[in-house]
């Protein structure tokens, strides 16, 4: 089954099906309109998957349009990163990239049309006064004293705004709708404000910039969008969307439909809060692998396929709900279980000397790159008299449930020999530094000849032919499921969201490309870090563990 065939139906697809069946539309045209003031996150991925996926499935078009109406917060850095993220996720936009700034001249003309119709006026209340005059949900607003200016005066003042004759915040253009409306968005919303800032597309041509609600609907209409898909927080804004299009001379009137935004547990989606994490250096940047940004997830080792599958599974509804982080982790775990080659790495190493092997002993052992995919081939892994195992895989004493190496007992080394721990060596602090063992020479990749059962299997690397590596063990950035609900979201940070360990990895792995995934056996899924990895200093990021340990912790 293809990815498109696997997509579940939803209320938006039902609307589209009905529109096509009735002849209301003969084709489908959607758009993804991010503001270039930050990096895309997993919530945007849901919108990308919905808008581009619908266009693909209905053989329609999807525009990438940058809602670039606030030059103070926007930057080409974000434009470039958004384009990269969309394409990395597996989608391509129709035709050229669009910018809301492409339509600044037309938007200005439509603003003049509203002024000429007596439906817009220049207001000189201060921003604080405008907020006060707007009222509250329980108290109606009151009219601005500037509301009833003549068309001629409003035209002249609007021209003065454009010519830079007003200071920022001293004047704005507002729609004349209804200050007593039960919907706050309809209480004479601001259409244009003054900002003396160069724009990344238009330079210094403009010092007045249109607001989102005025720009968005007109841009949709100019591009021939048939289905304008927004998240639920824009539900009330639909009234303004329709009001603007109903009151200007334009031939196309798209319809806006709202769906629930993605609320992912143990994460935040607020750009302001994410920016605070970056500026306060709580994380090392927007691509920190603990961030919910697409660039952060990519650097951590998430694949585009796993993110698309996550978006498919959570579906599209009109009800806000919280999605468990485990659902996202399950998607990458399943994807990497199928595609990631296996390798061995020891993250918390302790030295093992197999005394029954001769000094200088080495042997190459053939190991499958994937237990269920023989077409992925095999690799040669060096085995030697001295190896490293994980410190957690040895105890001097243990109960019967412990199936690893115990003093005086046996364990199997993965794809190698059965060994038995004889004695240990410790440092002055009592820390074990070396475990001395003997091996059964007849057990190389096979069971003991006498029929005895050796239940435990542990991984290892050669001490002589492995390479020192850094392992970054990433976990959830927050320790509470809903950090945004906390009075101070920073108080919910998980102190163990990053643990750095120094260990060893089998010799062939450091030749990996950055971002290339591996399953380090018994440890989890890792990838070569795109920022710090080099063949002489390999750095690996843990993408996800082999199982959901958070669920286990919650059950305790």
Curated annotation (Swiss-Prot):
CDD domains for the chain: GlnRS_core
Annotated localization: Cytoplasm
Motif annotated as 'HIGH' region, chain positions: 34-44
GO cellular component: cytosol
Catalytic activity of the protein: tRNA(Gln) + L-glutamine + ATP = L-glutaminyl-tRNA(Gln) + AMP + diphosphate
Coarse class of the protein's main subcellular location: cytoplasm
Entry EC no(s): 6.1.1.18
UniProt cross-references to Pfam families, sorted A to Z: tRNA-synt_1c, tRNA-synt_1c_C, tRNA-synt_1c_C2
Gene3D superfamilies: Glutamyl-trna Synthetase, Domain 2, Glutamyl-tRNA Synthetase, Domain 3, HUPs, Ribosomal Protein L25, Chain P
Highest taxon of the lineage: Bacteria
Residue sites binding ATP per the record: 35-37, 41-47, 231, 261-262, 269-271
Alphabetically ordered keywords of this record: Aminoacyl-tRNA synthetase, ATP-binding, Cytoplasm, Ligase, Nucleotide-binding, Protein biosynthesis
Family annotation (NCBIfam families): glnS (TIGR00440), PRK14703.1 (NF011291)
Assembly description: Monomer.
Alphabetized PANTHER family for the sequence: GLUTAMATE--TRNA LIGASE (PTHR43097:SF5), GLUTAMINE-TRNA LIGASE (PTHR43097)
Protein name, as recorded: Glutamine--tRNA ligase
UniProt source species: Sodalis glossinidius (strain morsitans)
